[in-house]
Amino acid sequence: MEKLDLHGVRHHEVDLMVENFIFLNQEEIPLTIICGGSSKMVELVKKVLDRTDSEYLEGKGLDFGRITVIRI
């Protein structure tokens, strides 16, 4: 399973990084994107995934900040 860790990534870099990651690794589904505890980072990632019509699962509770992409 491929993983993208966004710790230390600036908000303005997220869009391009996430889009490149999901399209370059679409054969490796499921994909994991680690956003950390930032609600803003989670929203930025979800915006990209929604725009690309990707299906994903959001982590809840202790898994908050982890998004698993299940279809692109």
PLM region spans:
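Long, charged, low-complexity intrinsically disordered regions
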Residues: 1-72
